[in-house]
Amino acid sequence: MALQLKTSIDIDAAPDAVWAVLSDLPAYPSWNPFIREARGELAAGERLDVKMQPEGGRAMRFRPTVLNAEPGRELRWRGRLVAPGVFDGEHRFAIEATPGGSRLLQEERFTGVLVPLLAKGLRTRTLPAFEQMNEAVKERAEAGSAKAAS
């Protein structure tokens, strides 16, 4: 079984400003309501150390592999629980230029034998956490763009 979660938000900032927020992993604890910590190099093939905690949920640490890190456009990684096929997630942040700035798309495709057991929690806790993170990225990117413009 597979489950796809998908959110997007329009941001009044250039794609590079949105990327600057997403790629500044050391700053995550100061602003990110979902990914509380993230360490590592944003380059294909590299492993990250990520601690997630949706509101009302338990903290979970995992070590995803970066699949793509294209500045101003996309950050994508794959994480696994235990072994391939048990519970896998491919997470993607895509940044699209719009006439007024950018659109941030955040999505994750979950596959594996545990998906049916975890689907309800993913929909009720993880999807709102994506939306909260999108709002926080928007706030931070727009604040950074306003500073740069002054």
Task: For each feature predicted by the language model, list its residue ranges.
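Hydrophobic ligand-binding cavity/cleft-lining segments
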Residues: 1-43, 103, 136, 149-150
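Hydrophobic-ligand binding "helix-grip"
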Residues: 29, 39, 53-103, 109-114, ...
